[in-house]
Amino acid sequence: MAKEELIELQGVVDEVLPDSRYRVTLDNGVAVGAYASGRIRKHRIRILAGDRVTLEMSPYDLTKGRINFRHKDERPSSAPANRNFVRR
């Protein structure tokens, strides 16, 4: 029996829950529960409320998803970018 294809969707993180779980609203308006994938946890990629993410969902359970990518912000960050550090 072949493995079913995963559905890939995009959404915005609404709420950060305990145990690296998140409440995400998809682009179509549906709210789902999601967890961070192992790769995201391994590399300690921080996901905050308001972040745009890509989820994978199983066609059998459309209430849960796995976050496998956090999109970079289009807005500039508040921290200065590489100020030509000089070692003394």
Swiss-Prot record:
Alphabetical keyword list: Cytoplasm, Initiation factor, Protein biosynthesis, RNA-binding, rRNA-binding
KW Cytoplasm (keyword) present: yes
Top-level taxon of origin: Bacteria
Chief location: cytoplasm
Classification via InterPro entries: NA-bd_OB-fold (IPR012340), RNA-binding_domain_S1_IF1 (IPR006196), TIF_IF1 (IPR004368)
One GO MF term: ribosome binding
Pfam families: eIF-1a
GO CC, any one term: cytosol
Residues covered by the S1-like domain: 1-72
Protein localization: Cytoplasm
Signal sequence, renumbered to the chain: none
Quaternary structure and partners: Component of the 30S ribosomal translation pre-initiation complex which assembles on the 30S ribosome in the order IF-2 and IF-3, IF-1 and N-formylmethionyl-tRNA(fMet); mRNA recruitment can occur at any time during PIC assembly.
NCBIfam families linked to this entry: infA (TIGR00008)
Family: Belongs to the IF-1 family.
Function: One of the essential components for the initiation of protein synthesis. Stabilizes the binding of IF-2 and IF-3 on the 30S subunit to which N-formylmethionyl-tRNA(fMet) subsequently binds. Helps modulate mRNA selection, yielding the 30S pre-initiation complex (PIC). Upon addition of the 50S ribosomal subunit IF-1, IF-2 and IF-3 are released leaving the mature 70S translation initiation complex.
Protein name in UniProt: Translation initiation factor IF-1 2
Origin organism lineage: Bacteria, Pseudomonadati, Pseudomonadota, Betaproteobacteria, Burkholderiales
Gene: infA2
